[in-house]
Amino acid sequence: MIGKLKGVVDTLEEDHVILDVHGVGYLVHCSGRTLSALPRAGEAAALFIETHVREDQIRLFGFSSAAERDWFRLLQGIQGIGTKTALAVLSTLSASELTQAIALGDKTTVARAPGVGPRVATRIITELKDKMPGFSASEPLAAQLGGGGVASAQGGAAADAVSALVNLGYGVPQANAAIAAALRGAGEGAKTEVLIRLGLKELAK
């Protein structure tokens, strides 16, 4: 199984790239967002890979980040969503934007993707709100948060929730304040997903 490819961009097309890896050209299907982030032909590039094997073909799907690949996998687990729709969602929304939209229950944002109407958007939010990837704190981030605030005071779910907000681009003080407010509303036993959702609502005020 191929997990990642690193090579030189040979050809860029509307829905795929051909990546030259030591003389072998791999045709890799990508979201529009990933394709637009790739360098021009002749320059080095790397992609996280998801491999689909069928009786009559092998297809490679490439992503600029592991988070985007994880979302691709999750989206396909929903009834009625195939590779085309999953890539359309990821062409419209970045991994962090999709995470935020699902956490807030924002079906209007999710429905912006081609082929995703309100009904499918609602299904995406309902089925994935408790499966959102990328919420575990890394050691550097945990150390950064450890200096004070709600993350160090509460630990566990609160620390993971603060980490998730920081990963979405919010500052540490903002994230701490938002999760502190979430804890006041939900109580200390609240799960990480609940704290993230409430924290994002605080930040959206």
UniProtKB/Swiss-Prot annotation:
InterPro entries: DNA_helicase_Holl-junc_RuvA_I, Hlx-hairpin-Hlx_DNA-bd_motif, NA-bd_OB-fold, RuvA, RuvA_2-like, RuvA_C, RuvA_C_sf. It holds the Pfam family RuvA_C. Homotetramer. Forms an RuvA(8)-RuvB(12)-Holliday junction (HJ) complex. HJ DNA is sandwiched between 2 RuvA tetramers; dsDNA enters through RuvA and exits via RuvB. An RuvB hexamer assembles on each DNA strand where it exits the tetramer. Each RuvB hexamer is contacted by two RuvA subunits (via domain III) on 2 adjacent RuvB subunits; this complex drives branch migration. In the full resolvosome a probable DNA-RuvA(4)-RuvB(12)-RuvC(2) complex forms which resolves the HJ. It comes from the Bacteria. Residues 1-64 are annotated as: Domain I. It is found in: Cytoplasm. The keyword Cytoplasm applies. The gene is ruvA. HAMAP family: DNA_HJ_migration_RuvA. Belongs to the RuvA family. Residues 144-152 are annotated as: Flexible linker. One of its GO terms (molecular function) is four-way junction DNA binding. Residues 65-143 are annotated as: Domain II. Keywords: Cytoplasm, DNA damage, DNA recombination, DNA repair, DNA-binding. The RuvA-RuvB-RuvC complex processes Holliday junction (HJ) DNA during genetic recombination and DNA repair, while the RuvA-RuvB complex plays an important role in the rescue of blocked DNA replication forks via replication fork reversal (RFR). RuvA specifically binds to HJ cruciform DNA, conferring on it an open structure. The RuvB hexamer acts as an ATP-dependent pump, pulling dsDNA into and through the RuvAB complex. HJ branch migration allows RuvC to scan DNA until it finds its consensus sequence, where it cleaves and resolves the cruciform DNA. Has three domains with a flexible linker between the domains II and III and assumes an 'L' shape. Domain III is highly mobile and contacts RuvB. One of its GO terms (cellular component) is Holliday junction resolvase complex. This is Holliday junction branch migration complex subunit RuvA. Residues 153-205 are annotated as: Domain III. GO terms for biological process: DNA recombination; DNA repair.
